[in-house]
Amino acid sequence: MEMESTAASTRFHQPHMERKMSAMTCEIFNELRLEGKLCDVVIKVNGFEFNAHKNILCSCSSYFRALFTSGWNNTEKKVYNIPGISPDMMKLIIEYAYTRTVPITPDNVEKLLAAADQFNIMGIVRGCCEFLKSELCLDNCIGICKFTDYYYCPELRQKAYMFILHNFEEMVKVSAEFLELSVTELKDIIEKDELNVKQEDAVFEAILKWISHDPQNRKQHISVLLPKVRLALMHAEYFMNNVKMNDYVKDSEECKPVIINALKAMYDLNMNGPSNSDFTNPLTRPRLPYAILFAIGGWSGGSPTNAIEAYDARADRWVNVTCEEESPRAYHGAAYLKGYVYIIGGFDSVDYFNSVKRFDPVKKTWHQVAPMHSRRCYVSVTVLSNFIYAMGGFDGYVRLNTAERYEPETNQWTLIAPMHEQRSDASATTLYGKVYICGGFNGNECLFTAEVYNTESNQWTVIAPMRSRRSGIGVIAYGEHVYAVGGFDGANRLRSAEAYSPVANTWRTIPTMFNPRSNFGIEVVDDLLFVVGGFNGFTTTFNVECYDEKTDEWYDAHDMSIYRSALSCCVVPGLANVGEYAARRDNFTGLALRDEVKYSASTSTLPV
């Protein structure tokens, strides 16, 4: 476990540590300690002596309480030799007993945690654990996780282990610690449903990298590791060329039935479609998604709806997670920031809202937060640098060019510079530290104009116009471009889409969607751009499709359960309770996301 050593340190303060004496008393006793007055104990470590007061040491450590009060120790004893600790660490321990603060650095955190554990000083243990959480990175996550084998740090262990699972692909590329895992440790990691990999190829490649580090001693472990890969979810070409023909696999008798079972499972999936056994078979069971796409509210059946569905991209399945206590809302905005989903503005067929609600997806609770300065239906919402931006919209009387932003820490909305044009039914996103808003309706015509907001100068700048007028548009940052998708041009709902390059200040056309739509949800999940629901010119739709910029193609995804337009989508990554929003792995009847069974209109398979 290595951490970058810096001159700076974190001084941990434990305000909630149990206290036998007041802070004032501790401060007075610390002055007496430093002056060598009224000390009644000497702690001796490797020849170094530390004067102290028994009461102060007992107040923060059960170790010292037992040491000073046990029956076999003379209560009048003054000098105690303490083994198993360095003088530097004992100095920090004693200082903490008096001040309840301790400097924690990359250089001392391991020894300090060991010392705090030895003396049962939970305040320092918690401080070291918080420090190690903040230092987690691709290079040290395995080491930190293993470090917790020796000390009781359950929250740190969980954090480190989930970091490994969530960042597996990137970690494998750079971590020297990965190559030193035991076969059992590697098996335990790659068999987890929470392992965050978009394709199972990455798991197999990680196994090969691990074996290649010590091939003579590790090649026999292929028989233990291969069954933990969801082989039937691989692209067939990769499986045949890279897995079935791999020398380690071919040389292992134990792997032969695994390969046969995988081929059979792949065949069954292609010929017969999904079955109830998909999620019970370890070769076909999709991983849990790292990020959940929420589709919130909208207009359905002639009125607003409170419906919320969660999309599991790894299983290509929607899950109804509607909270019946929540009120219906349409033409609103949604944003995810710092653990919360915010629902902003909108309309319930009677009132135009300036209200904002915040949803905690872990606790599943709703709270009202500060309202906006203006009522905003058809509002455009995006997030940048810990602020939520709300722009334009319709207040029930006029289309707006005003804009404001929300800061969660202060629970306040602040007006920013107004846009150049009035825009309702526009859409916004952020890219490279700037806010982009495109299209919309100004009360007279659908717009093809677009603007960019600079937060440093608080100024809007007009950029190159889109190639089509688009109201009810979907705008999203994807890769290095701003994508403008669908909408209404004043005559028709659109299938067309285009991408803006901030560097060139130009728009280029991309392939059209399968279905025309306006007033739909748009988000990026697993490096795919999803469009969700909307209005096709005749009716609301539950249709969903996704675009891959690498293949420059659109693909069908699983339909929502509810026909709706005027919804809003947002993506929530890294949920601790992701299983509560994902398709159930223990009782599944839906369609697993597989290259072999997902087709575009041209019958091309989903991208690898």
Swiss-Prot record:
GO cellular component, one term: cytoplasm
This protein's record includes keyword Phosphoprotein: yes
Domain BTB, residue spans: 39-106
Disulfide-linked positions: none
SUPFAM superfamilies, per database record: Kelch motif, POZ domain
Tissues expressing the protein: Testis specific.
Compartments where found: Cytoplasm
Additional observations: Does not seem to associate with actin.
Oligomer and partners: Self-associates. Interacts with CUL3; indicative for the participation in an E3 ubiquitin ligase complex.
Role this protein plays: May be a substrate-specific adapter of a CUL3-based E3 ubiquitin-protein ligase complex which mediates the ubiquitination and subsequent proteasomal degradation of target proteins during spermatogenesis. Required for male fertility.
Name of the protein: Kelch-like protein 10
Organism: Mus musculus
Phylogenetic lineage: Eukaryota, Metazoa, Chordata, Craniata, Vertebrata
